[in-house]
């Protein structure tokens, strides 16, 4: 539940903000201390890790309680550190081994879940919003139109799932979207989105307060779009199927002219040409 990368970011899922419910679900073990668990982001920020992500498992308690808790947590971080969450994740209770959604009286139906996602997007327009492959292709398509900005493809939930020898029967939960990454990328293009593999902001130190200032003042556009196109081009050259590669090139041709700054636009054209000739890892 907690991932740190080069001491630059921390993503932690709260499970539930209801203290009583949390303690019932975590009766013992290192996660049993509600206060310590809930203040993990504060400790990360105090230690100089200025990029954090929030998440709550919708369905463990009433969605109203969790929704308010999540936004109050974001508001607290912004008030104390002048930096809101870089991402907000919105998983919900889904079927899995020994997990029946009908056993959870607070499980969200699709319509309510869509409203929760839309309201979080309105309340925190600066944040990246994540939905996983627990959701179906149809639901992920609907959520993309409501504010989701980050999705996965080709995910594994089993122990050692990305290795050659997978531990059988170790899946944490069932996937509802089993498409490959290539299929998800091409699907996004068909839906008029620009898939991006960019990590430039992390690598250049554009995190925390610097990142927040840029996204809140719409200063990130001349960076995100060019980097998205160049990283997508690199994916197309190295990994994509023939159809997806063709769709990537068509998308780039359509989008390149919409980069507002002329110098950035020309630089992006140069980077795209360089990628086609074999250069890699180019970004602003």
Feature names for model-found ranges:
Residues 22-34, 101-109, 169-174:
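Glycine-rich tight-turn/loop motif centered on a GG-T
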